Regions:
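Transmembrane signal-anchor hairpin modules in multi-pass inner-membrane enzymes, especially those
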Residues: 1-85, 116-119, 123, 178-187, ...
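Juxtamembrane membrane-water interface segments that cap and precede transmembrane helices
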Residues: 19-25, 145-157, 400-412
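Membrane-embedded glycan transfer/ligation machinery
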Residues: 22, 37-40, 73-76, 100-101, ...
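Alpha-helical transmembrane segments of multi-pass inner-membrane proteins
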Residues: 24-27, 78-82, 116-150, 156-291
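Membrane-interface micro-motifs in multi-pass membrane enzymes
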Residues: 31-37, 92-96, 155-169, 204-207, ...
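Membrane-embedded alpha-helical segments of multi-pass membrane proteins
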Residues: 35-51, 94-105, 163-172, 210-217
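Aromatic-anchored transmembrane helix interface
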Residues: 66-73, 87-110, 120-124, 129, ...
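Long extracytoplasmic/lumenal interhelical loops at the membrane interface
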Residues: 322, 336-341, 347-374, 378-412
Length: 412
């Protein structure tokens, strides 16, 4: 294999070798570094301009309908500058969106003909995911042991934990797709898949879990359709719908909790708490939640009385958990169980959206919908999107703090 790979690389023109380098930087940079990603785009565009085979580029572009749709969307954003008042922001936003066009352009206009070189790029992609995830996990475990980190979302050192979680799911999909093609490396492939599945589970990134589920589900369905197993496909679809319905029921059906003022000895709790912690009883925890409410719910989750004796029975680790905003002992666990209880708390108990990813996103979506209703034909223009959100948040007297008043979507 390595001899074939070496021969394929040797047969490339110098511009082809530069283009391959650019693609390698893209495949590594999309996982680990914006700098490498930007460098790959610059080198890639430069190699295309040096080769100057514009006729061949145009043929490839015309043959790819998906890329044509991307160009149309980008052009519509550009045209919206005509009715944008904040031109500097609009130009900045278009510059950021350029990567959505440039990266597909580099992959489409000069496709690699060698399967070995394609596999090399995918190997770089998966290797970057494995190495970065191992570093993330090791650093997180060390920081946890030193009480320097209290939120699993801080585990990603490569930018957004949501974006990284989705990339990990794609990496698993690549490994599964090439499982049968790697006869000599099946054991290694199984180890890599197992590690990345564990990382996805442990990191609690809901977008990553959903992406992994979709990849496995659609991949399995397409495989069974190819094998003409229609009845099995129908059974899997029905089973998936039932499980999805059960999960939604488990999340959204509320639990009954006792009222904090009627069933809690707040005076006794405050006296014992002041001995155990430096955080004032009437203050907020590290997730900006009312600390005494976090304490009551944490005591409930451990089946302890809401009084001074219950507080005294808490361990030092429990005290740190409460200070860090964990309202349920189950939230301190790893994986889906912790995420499940965290989501239930957000849906049924949390009154302040700050510090809660789901509630912050729902609040932003609500503001975005109201902006859309006011400008449903032409929009506000790409330059005025951020300003429109600022005005809408003020108009609605949003509970979101200024640093959390973001636009309602991520560009991926």
């Amino acid at each position: 294999m390595f001899k074939i790979l070496r021969d394929d690389f040797s047969n490339l023109k110098w511009t082809g070798k530069v283009h391959l380098l650019a693609l390698a930087l893209l495949f590594v940079g999309v996982v680990t570094s914006k700098f490498l990603l930007s460098l790959g785009m610059i080198i890639g565009v430069g190699s295309l301009l040096m080769e100057r085979d514009f006729k061949a580029y145009w043929i490839e572009i015309r043959a790819n309908r998906f890329f044509l749709y991307l160009i149309i969307i980008y052009l519509l954003c550009f045209i919206s500058l005509l009715w944008s008042q904040n031109l500097p922001y609009g130009l900045h936003d278009l510059r950021v969106k350029t990567s959505l066009v440039v990266i597909p352009l580099l992959l489409i206009v000069k496709p690699l003909k060698s399967n070995q070189l394609k596999n090399l790029l995918l190997l770089l992609f998966v290797s970057s995911i494995v190495i970065s995830s191992l570093i993330n996990f090791a650093v997180y475990q060390y920081a946890m042991s030193k009480d320097a980190i209290y939120d699993v979302r801080q585990m990603s050192l490569c930018g957004s934990h949501i974006r990284y979680g989705i990339i990990v799911a794609f990496g698993i999909g690549v490994c599964v797709h090439y499982y049968n093609a790697l006869d000599k490396y099946k054991f290694t492939n199984v180890v890599v898949i197992s590690w990345l599945v564990f990382y996805t589970y442990y990191s609690q990134v809901l977008a990553g879990l959903i992406s992994l589920f979709i990849i496995i589900f659609l991949g399995g369905i397409l495989y069974l359709i190819k094998k003409k197993k229609e009845k099995l496909v129908l059974g899997i679809v029905l089973f998936t719908l039932i499980i999805t319905g059960f999960c939604c029921y488990a999340l959204f059906v509320p639990e009954t909790h006792k009222n904090i003022s009627e069933h809690s000895d707040l005076v006794g709790m405050e006296k014992s708490w002041s001995v155990r912690s430096t955080y004032p009883f009437d203050s907020i925890d590290n997730k900006n939640q009312i600390l005494k409410e976090t304490l009551v719910r944490y005591l409930d989750s451990k089946a302890l009385a809401n009084d001074s004796i219950g507080v005294e029975k808490l361990s030092e680790k429990d005290i740190r958990n409460i200070e860090n905003g964990y309202a349920d002992i189950h939230e301190t666990e790893s994986g889906l169980i912790a995420r499940y209880y965290g989501l239930r708390y957000q849906i049924h108990e949390a009154k302040n959206p700050n510090g809660h990813s789901l509630l912050q996103r729902l609040s932003s979506w609500s503001s975005a919908w109201n902006i859309t209703k006011d400008h449903w034909i032409m929009g506000v223009g790409v330059g005025d999107v951020a300003d429109a959100f600022v005005l809408q948040y003020e108009k609605e007297h949003s509970l979101l703090r200024e640093e959390n008043r973001l636009r309602a979507h991520n560009n991926y």
